[in-house]
From Swiss-Prot:
Interacts with FLNA. Interacts with the 20S proteasome subunit PSMA7. May be heavily O-glycosylated. Residues 49-101, 153-175 are annotated as: Disordered. It is found in: Cell membrane; Cytoplasm. One of its GO terms (biological process) is positive regulation of endothelial cell apoptotic process. The chain crosses the membrane at residues 125-145. Residues 25-124 are extracellular. This is Endothelial cell-specific chemotaxis regulator. Highest expression in endothelial cells. Also detected in vascular smooth muscle, macrophages, lymphocytes, and mast cells. Residues 146-205 are cytoplasmic.
Length: 205
């Protein structure tokens, strides 16, 4: 009779708590006598707090075995056994580790901004390399021009020293003079012949 009455009382209390489920959280505790007699069930209700790390006063003194596995920032379920009774508790962990990991990733992705010293060193290196290239090009051009000038001088110095060049020029000039004299003599002969023919014709008339 004692157990039947206790069960009926439990069902009545559970029905009442279903209507007030939004304002209170039921926790069931079971007590057993050490002498092996019949145990009675008792229900206690405690208000639910909005704090995620809130632990009821009835559960504060009981040992709990929390599992070490779980995702950061989410609830970690843990189960414990005390005096033959099983219970499940739900504990929330603040998401500090996730925020720290995100901040570390953002810091790693941010590239260091170039400073004025690095910009100046890069600019100086570019100017120096440009000047060196210009100097090399000027040296090459000066060498090419000097080589051409030397080649021209050597050719001019070799031309007057060639054997037979003066004789050829003199022979060409004498040949030209002889041609001119021959043409003059032939013209004189033609004129003289024409004069003689005209005189003979006049005499005949």
């Amino acid at each position: 009779m004692g157990t039947a009455g206790a069960m009926q009382l439990c069902w009545v209390i559970l029905g009442f708590l279903l209507f007030r489920g939004h304002n209170s959280q039921p926790t069931m505790t079971q007590t057993s006598s050490s002498q092996g007699g019949l145990g009675g069930l008792s229900l206690t209700t405690e208000p639910v707090s909005s704090n995620p790390g809130y632990i009821p006063s009835s559960e504060a003194n009981r040992p709990s075995h929390l599992s070490s596995t779980g995702t950061p920032g989410a609830g970690v379920p843990s189960s414990g056994r005390d005096g033959g009774t099983s219970r499940d508790t739900f504990q929330t962990v603040p998401p500090n580790s996730t925020t720290m990991s995100l901040s570390m990733r953002e810091d790693a992705t941010i590239l260091p901004s170039p400073t004025s010293e690095t910009v100046l060193t890069v600019a100086a290196f570019g100017v120096i390399s440009f000047i060196v290239i210009l100097v090399v090009v000027v040296i090459i051009l000066v060498g090419v021009v000097s080589l051409r000038f030397k080649c021209r001088k050597s050719k001019e110095s070799e031309d007057p020293q060639k054997p037979g060049s003066s004789g050829l020029s003199e022979s060409c000039s004498t040949a030209n003079g002889e041609k001119d004299s021959i043409t003059l003599i032939s013209m004189k002969n033609i004129n003289m012949n024409n004069g003689k023919q005209s005189l003979s014709a006049e005499k005949v008339l």
